[in-house]
């Protein structure tokens, strides 16, 4: 029995080390040892039965029964010790086998957990890499940090307090802004209209000033119809004619004062009519003036140049022939 226990211990050490043989060979050795120990236990039972029969016969046949009793006691004690030892060896073998199996199970569980952990780590790395790649491709929707709301129109009034009041205030602010923008646009248009009106007014005033500067009393009485025509022509041209003869003309012609006053009244009335027509026309054409100002300027300059040329070619009126 002691040899069996020693051999089993050696087998257990070999299983723990696994240095000399493979796992299958060790398992075969363990099964053989276990079967041998079970056979020894069966043989022990038969030996005990045979010993009991022998002592029974000896006790009945021998005269010295005391000696037979002592031998029986010694044999029974030895047999009991051997059986206990044998049963202890078997229990040790069984417990060692169970412990080995549990150790193997623990080792396999540890290996499985390590493999599972490695798989989780690799999956996490793959997920991070995939997220980093997808984040460069997908354009995430942008919302305000404090107001990330679900879809739908009914979510806004429930999420924001006093939503109706805020909406009314927003509409009022938009209306006020529209009113202010319209007022600013009207002021800008008025500012743009003022220089154009002043231009037309200056152009319209130029003939009246020229007519006032040229007095009809300096002209001879025989040519009353001619000065009116010239005055009309001069009222159409914006550049006043300043000739030394008109300035140096003599003033002592009293009989023609009434005629000159009537001519002046007619000129003033015609000038007022022209000014009124010019102002109404300027008010109508203010919107189109920004586009037509360069063309009008060119035409105006051409007309001025042509009139100056025509006036240079005309003969100067001689006022000294009457004297």
Curated annotation (Swiss-Prot):
GO cellular component, one term: cytoplasm
Annotated Low complexity bias: 204-222
Matching InterPro entries: ABI
Biased composition annotated in UniProt, kind: Basic and acidic residues: 281-294
Positions of the UniProt region annotated as Disordered: 185-323
Polar residues composition bias: residue spans: 243-268
Compartments, as annotated in UniProt: Cytoplasm, Cytoskeleton
Keywords for the protein's UniProt record, in alphabetical order: Cytoplasm, Cytoskeleton
Gene3D superfamilies registered for this protein in UniProt: 6.10.140.1620
Positions with biased composition (Basic residues): 295-310
Family: Belongs to the ABI family.
PANTHER family: ABL INTERACTOR FAMILY MEMBER, PROTEIN ABIL2-RELATED
Subunit-level organization: Binds SCAR.
Function according to Swiss-Prot or TrEMBL: Involved in regulation of actin and microtubule organization. Part of a WAVE complex that activates the Arp2/3 complex.
Name of the protein described by the UniProt record: Putative protein ABIL2
Species the sequence originates in: Oryza sativa subsp. japonica (Rice)
Organism ancestry: Eukaryota, Viridiplantae, Streptophyta, Embryophyta, Tracheophyta
């Amino acid at each position: 029995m002691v040899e069996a226990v020693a051999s089993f211990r050696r087998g257990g050490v070999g299983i723990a080390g696994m240095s000399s043989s493979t796992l299958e060979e060790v398992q075969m050795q363990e099964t053989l040892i276990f079967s041998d120990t079970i056979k020894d236990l069966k043989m022990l039972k038969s030996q005990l039965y045979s010993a009991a029969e022998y002592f029974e016969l000896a006790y009945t046949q021998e005269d010295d029964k005391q000696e037979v009793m002592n031998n029986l006691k010694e044999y029974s004690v030895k047999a009991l010790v051997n059986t206990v030892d044998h049963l202890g060896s078997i229990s040790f073998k069984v417990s060692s086998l169970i412990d080995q199996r549990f150790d193997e199970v623990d080792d396999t569980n540890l290996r499985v957990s390590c493999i599972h952990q490695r798989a989780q780590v690799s999956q996490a790395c793959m997920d991070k890499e995939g997220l980093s790649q997808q984040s460069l491709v997908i354009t995430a929707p942008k919302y305000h940090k404090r107001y990330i709301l679900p879809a739908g129109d009914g979510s806004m009034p429930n999420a924001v307090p006093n939503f109706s009041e805020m909406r009314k205030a927003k509409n009022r602010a938009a209306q006020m802004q529209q009113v202010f923008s319209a007022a600013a646009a009207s002021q800008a248009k008025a500012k743009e209209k003022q220089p154009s009106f002043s231009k037309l007014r200056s152009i319209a005033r130029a003939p009246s000033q020229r007519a006032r500067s040229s007095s009809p009393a300096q002209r001879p009485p025989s040519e009353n119809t001619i000065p009116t025509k010239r005055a009309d022509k001069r009222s159409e041209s914006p550049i006043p004619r300043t000739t030394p003869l008109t300035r140096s003309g003599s003033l002592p012609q009293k009989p023609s004062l009434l005629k000159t006053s009537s001519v002046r009244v007619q000129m003033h009335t015609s000038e007022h009519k022209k000014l009124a027509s010019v102002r109404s026309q300027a008010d109508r054409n203010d919107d189109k003036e920004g586009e037509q100002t360069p063309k009008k300027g060119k035409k105006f300059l051409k007309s001025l140049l042509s009139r100056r040329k025509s006036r240079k070619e005309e003969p100067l009126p001689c006022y000294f022939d009457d004297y």
